[in-house]
Regions:
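Short amphipathic alpha-helices in soluble, non-transmembrane regions
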Residues: 160-163
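N-terminal leader/linker segments that precede catalytic domains of diphosphate-processing enzymes
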Residues: 1-158, 172-197
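Basic polyanion-binding and macromolecular-assembly surfaces
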Residues: 166-168
Length: 197
């Protein structure tokens, strides 16, 4: 069965989509986005959505911090999207699917992605950072990130799918050492968080 993903028409992105990088947002902006999703969001077959830049696939994207460190992951070749093999990331997240449907699909999908991708024995507290847009490459052209941070406060975090990801907390110098392999979104967010060269 073909995966269906939540998309928002470009012209319905609150505040517009004509920006590059991370646009800071607050709770009011998140509420506006939620209303836009409830009003104009729709599900498309993923293969169709991947080739349709008139729509943005919404991706909740979470960066886990522990003080000055960030959870840095390296993707293996076992991951699903070959465009991302061998790349590094400071965020976890993924597509919103019909299983997330309801009054707050965005937050339901965010929580589902957290549980699918990470192993923790504590409850995360998601803090909105902003919207992330990058139309400079084929992956970014069809996605819109909704970026959150979570503070680990010294608590353990591990990746769930060891065959697809390897992860550990890293300080700014370690993130900088992986800079050339960072996915575009990760480099944009890392720079905003003061973790880039």
């Amino acid at each position: 069965m073909t995966e269906r993903v939540l998309v928002l028409p470009r012209d319905r992105v609150p505040g517009g989509y004509d920006f590059h990088g991370l646009r800071p947002a607050d709770g009011a902006a998140l509420d506006t986005l939620r209303v836009a999703v409830m009003t104009h969001g729709m599900y498309l077959d993923r293969p169709v959505a991947e080739d349709d830049p008139s729509h943005k696939q919404l991706i909740p994207y979470v960066v886990v911090r522990d003080g000055a460190s960030v959870f840095l992951m390296h993707r293996t070749d076992a991951g699903g999207d070959p465009r991302l093999h061998g790349r590094a990331s400071i965020g976890v997240g993924g597509h919103l699917n019909p299983v997330d449907e309801g009054e707050d699909a965005l937050m339901a999908g965010l929580r589902r992605e957290w549980d699918e991708e990470l192993v923790t024995d504590w409850e995360p507290r998601f803090e909105l950072v902003g919207l992330l847009n990058d139309d400079t490459n084929p992956v970014g052209a069809v996605h819109l990130g909704v970026v959150f941070t979570v503070e680990a406060d010294g608590r353990a975090v591990a990746v769930r799918e060891h065959d697809k990801l390897v992860g550990a907390f890293a300080v700014a110098d370690e993130v900088a050492a992986s800079w050339e392999r960072l996915e575009t979104w990760s480099s944009l967010v890392a720079r905003e968080l003061g973790l880039g060269p």
